Amino acid sequence: MLYSGDANLTDEQIAKLPFDLYRQGYEYYWKTHAHPNSTFKYTTSSLLDLMRFDATDHIALVNKPLLMIAGSKADSLYMSEDAFAKATGTTDKELVRIEGATHIETYWVPQYVQAAMDKLTGFYRRTL
C-alpha cells in the first residue's frame, strides 16, 4: 500500500504557506485538533479519487431546500458560489457568507460558529 500526504511541517514552514485554507487547515487538523491516532496520511489511490471528485457534478439534481454557509474571507468561497449557481433544481436556496470568517475559522471561532448555528437553526425549523 502506498501512502501520501505526511508533510510534517515546522511552524516556520506553516507560517509561509500562501493561503489561509492551507495554513489554518494544517494548524487545525495537524496541531490543535488532530486525533491522536491520525497519521495525516492518505492511501495514494484514495487521494487520487478525492482529487478527481467534483461535488457539483450532480448538484442540479438537488430539489429540496438548500442552505450553504461560507466565510466571506474563505479561500474556498468561490467554490461555494460556483456550487450555489449550479444548484438549479431548487429555488429555495440561500448562500450565507459569514462576514470576516475564513474557511477554517467557521469551525471553531465562537462568533462565526454561532452565526452558522443561528442560520442552521432557522433553516431546520422551517424545512424539517
Question: What residue spans do the PLM features occupy?
Answer:
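Catalytic active-site module of serine/aspartate enzymes centered on a nucleophile-bearing elbow/loop
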Residues: 99-128
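Active-site phosphate/pyrophosphate- and oxyanion-stabilizing loops and adjacent acidic/basic residues
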Residues: 56, 81-85
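Short beta-strand/loop motif that positions the catalytic acidic residue
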Residues: 62, 68-70
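Catalytic histidine neighborhood in serine/cysteine hydrolases
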Residues: 88-104
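Alpha/beta-hydrolase
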Residues: 1-57, 64
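Structural motif corresponding to alpha-helix initiation and N-cap regions
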Residues: 52-56, 77, 110
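Conserved alpha/beta-hydrolase "acid-adjacent" motif
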Residues: 51, 70-82
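Short, conserved loop/helix-junction motifs that constitute active-site signature segments
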Residues: 59-63, 86-90
